[in-house]
Structures are given as structure tokens and as C-alpha cells.
Amino acid sequence: MAEEKQKPRMKVHYVGVIRKILQEKFHYKNEMQIPRVDKIVINMGIGEATSDSKKPSIAAGDLSLITGQKAVVTYASSSIAGFKVREGMPLGAKVTLRKDRMFEFLDRLVTIALPRVRDFRGLNPKSFDGRGNFAMGIKEHIVFPEINYDKVDQIWGMDIIVCTTAKTDDEARELLRAFNFPFRS
């Protein structure tokens, strides 16, 4: 008999609680209009990649540990002489998370990683792009429990973009607030 896979905690919370909260607040005509998290894109830009081309692959390995999905090394699309960057040079790593892995990462981000950030005063509520997507940055990738602090030789930052199906920033803000994102007041 096949084992039934356990659903992510945040997904169960979204389906059971968050959808009802958003429906009551915004009075959607159709159930499909209720905003949901579409995908999460995590990007690490490695500044030292110009001098050492192995660093982006190390960063991709760390990003794979954090997300549970293989990271892709990103390359320069054009040459920029001022930054000593040539076209095709490896510059960083990125991962796009969807479905269950996305909800699992969201859970770890809100409950474990953000409370471990030094001098954390809350997320900026103005970091929305006008179309319901939220972007944030973390200065140290070691706040995630999957990274062994003793084995890390260099600390990198990362950009986290949460893409939602919300039409406005207010809808997206309420969606993420329901997911317990700690916004500044």
C-alpha cells in the first residue's frame, strides 16, 4: 500500500484558514480570484565571482541545501568593463520554487530563518512592486539551519522574491501577513 505524503503545514494553513480570511476581507466573486503564492525565486549574486570562478558553484551548492532543489549557476549576459565582467562568466546562482517545496521553504523562512537574522526589526511593508510581488534581501545565508556554520568559508547574501497572483499590493500584503510575515508597523 502506498504511503500518503504529508502536505506542507503552510499549504494546509492556506487552504483551511487564509483563503477564508482573504474572502471575508476583499469579498471576491469567484474562488479563483483569491490570491495565492505562485512561486518563490531565490537569487545569490556573488561579487567575488570575477576573481574566482568556483565561488558561484559553491554558492549553488549552499542554495541547493537551503531549498532542497538543485540551484542553477547564472552567467553574465553582457560584458561590463567597469566591473571586470565578461559575457558568459559565472556570476551567481538561483532557484525557482513552486508547489510543496515553495510552502516548505516559506515555513522555514518565517519560523526559523527570519528570527535568526541579526538586528531584525521586521520586513519593509513597502517592498512590493505594485503588482503584488514582494522582494526582500538577507545579508547572511547562514541563518538557515541547513547550512553548517563551521564548514562555511564565506558568508553570502541572497534576494528572495515572493510572486503572488494578487492584483494589488494591499491584497498581497494581507496574504503574506496571514502567512505570519513579520512586517514593520
From Swiss-Prot:
Gene Ontology CC annotation, any one: ribonucleoprotein complex
Gene Ontology process terms (BP): translation
Recorded GO MF terms: rRNA binding; structural constituent of ribosome; tRNA binding
SUPFAM superfamilies in UniProt: RL5-like
Pfam families the record matches: Ribosomal_L5, Ribosomal_L5_C
Highest taxon of the lineage: Bacteria
InterPro entries with a match to the protein in the record: Ribosomal_uL5, Ribosomal_uL5_bac-type, Ribosomal_uL5_C, Ribosomal_uL5_dom_sf, Ribosomal_uL5_N
Keywords: Ribonucleoprotein, Ribosomal protein, RNA-binding, rRNA-binding, tRNA-binding
Entry coiled-coil feature ranges: none
Subunit note: Part of the 50S ribosomal subunit; part of the 5S rRNA/L5/L18/L25 subcomplex. Contacts the 5S rRNA and the P site tRNA. Forms a bridge to the 30S subunit in the 70S ribosome.
Family per similarity comment: Belongs to the universal ribosomal protein uL5 family.
Function: This is one of the proteins that bind and probably mediate the attachment of the 5S RNA into the large ribosomal subunit, where it forms part of the central protuberance. In the 70S ribosome it contacts protein S13 of the 30S subunit (bridge B1b), connecting the 2 subunits; this bridge is implicated in subunit movement. Contacts the P site tRNA; the 5S rRNA and some of its associated proteins might help stabilize positioning of ribosome-bound tRNAs.
PANTHER family on file: 60S RIBOSOMAL PROTEIN L11-RELATED (PTHR11994)
Protein name: Large ribosomal subunit protein uL5
Species whose genome carries this gene: Bartonella bacilliformis (strain ATCC 35685 / KC583 / Herrer 020/F12,63)
Classification lineage: Bacteria, Pseudomonadati, Pseudomonadota, Alphaproteobacteria, Hyphomicrobiales
